[in-house]
Amino acid sequence: MDLENKVKKMGLGHEQGFGAPCLKCKEKCEGFELHFWRKICRNCKCGQEEHDVLLSNEEDRKVGKLFEDTKYTTLIAKLKSDGIPMYKRNVMILTNPVAAKKNVSINTVTYEWAPPVHNQALARQYMQMLPKEKQPVAGSEGAQYRKKQLAKQLPAHDQDPSKCHELSPREVKEMEQFVKKYKSEALGVGDVKLPCEMDAQGPKKMYIPGGDRSTPPAAGAMEDKSAEHKSTQYSCYCCKLNMKEGDPAIYAERAGYDKLWHPACFVCSVCHELLVDMIYFWKNEKLYCGRHYCDSEKPRCAGCDELIFSNEYTQAENQNWHLKHFCCFDCDSILAGEIYVMVNDKPVCKPCYVKNHAVVCQGCHNAIDPEVQRVTYNNFSWHASTECFLCSCCSKCLIGQKFMPVEGMVFCSVECKKMMS
């Protein structure tokens, strides 16, 4: 398929999750409606991950595409219908007998994801070492956390040009090369193993970048492996604390098997969130989630949340923007050369600011223009003028004078305050 056809096929998937309720805004949001180029709801401005959108198949497709053309093809299966790679997510179901007065009932716990290991006891141990609120039990807070991190850490628009907004053929080609590069140089999936088992495999099976660092025994020397095993101390690469004997650890092949992590310490070095499904990116001796690895390689547009592959883009307020996306957060009008105000780190044009965000003057009860001087005390504001910042009793101008605040009123003296009380 040539680049022009790829560009024509692009779309942000506006039908996905349409009308889903917002878990954050509740009834204030009319339901999810994807903005035509931002990755947010048009109604409440929250992300799709904040809405109760059923995306299990879509997420499995996204992760499946991430693992396509990598060494992790054992974690995907291609659908016969369309050939799209699907993530073979490992689901773990645990059954525990619960004693009742008459009969023994079975309590079933389903984990929406679990480490792909043959030893279920090891997988169970791994889960128990995660914070309770982050264990992906179906229908729980932990399952919602995993869903949110899948969306946040592994954005589809960081790997699939068809999920981006109006890329040029040149940008599509550059993005494909970028994705191919990080798949071959940085992408990995953690392994859950017991440290003593890894030690027993010996140095020949250890992956260490730059060669084997172990020192072979001298000729004729006897190795006391039992003594070596007893004295071995394993410490977590993140928190530096020792591993407890019998506890599982996570290894990352790209980091080398001389490094290991507690399950709860296998986190992104930037956002410090658990690496979802143990999917990591390794760079400069650090673990990253997909989002923050890409951020370390490319500028990201603060408007559309996509990586910038264009040679021309703008920088404002310590953020990067596609030229066409430096727009008012409220009305989407282009802001180049216009006056704007930052509201919660989002640029807003002057008319929208006055209409939707400006504070109201306690004196004249009109909105205060962002370019006009004002006086603020606690949550109250006034125009810094002789017409507005006045004593609430005698109308004396208080600019540059001492005053006594009482809720939304100000007084020049105790006498004036008493007269109004």
Curated annotation (Swiss-Prot):
SUPFAM superfamilies: Glucocorticoid receptor-like (DNA-binding domain)
Protein's UniProt keywords contain Zinc: yes
Keyword Transmembrane helix: no
Comp. bias (Basic and acidic residues): 155-164
Occurrences of domain LIM zinc-binding (ranges): 234-297, 299-359, 362-421
Main location: cytoplasm
Gene Ontology molecular-function annotations: zinc ion binding
Domain PET: 92-199
Compartments it resides in: Cytoplasm; Cell junction, Focal adhesion
One Gene Ontology term, aspect cellular component: cytoplasm
This protein's UniProt keywords: Cell junction, Cytoplasm, LIM domain, Metal-binding, Repeat, Zinc
Pfam families the UniProt entry points to: LIM (PF00412), PET (PF06297)
Biological process (GO), any one: negative regulation of cell population proliferation
Region (Disordered): 133-164
Quaternary organization: Interacts via LIM domain 1 with ZYX. Interacts (via LIM domain 3) with ENAH and VASP. Interacts with ALKBH4, talin, actin, alpha-actinin, GRIP1 and PXN. Interacts (via LIM domain 2) with ACTL7A (via N-terminus). Heterodimer with ACTL7A; the heterodimer interacts with ENAH to form a heterotrimer.
Family indicated by similarity: Belongs to the prickle / espinas / testin family.
Domain notes per entry: The N-terminal and the C-terminal halves of the protein can associate with each other, thereby hindering interactions with ZYX.
Physiological role: Scaffold protein that may play a role in cell adhesion, cell spreading and in the reorganization of the actin cytoskeleton. Plays a role in the regulation of cell proliferation. May act as a tumor suppressor.
Name this protein carries in UniProt: Testin
Organism: Saimiri boliviensis boliviensis
Gene name of this polypeptide: TES
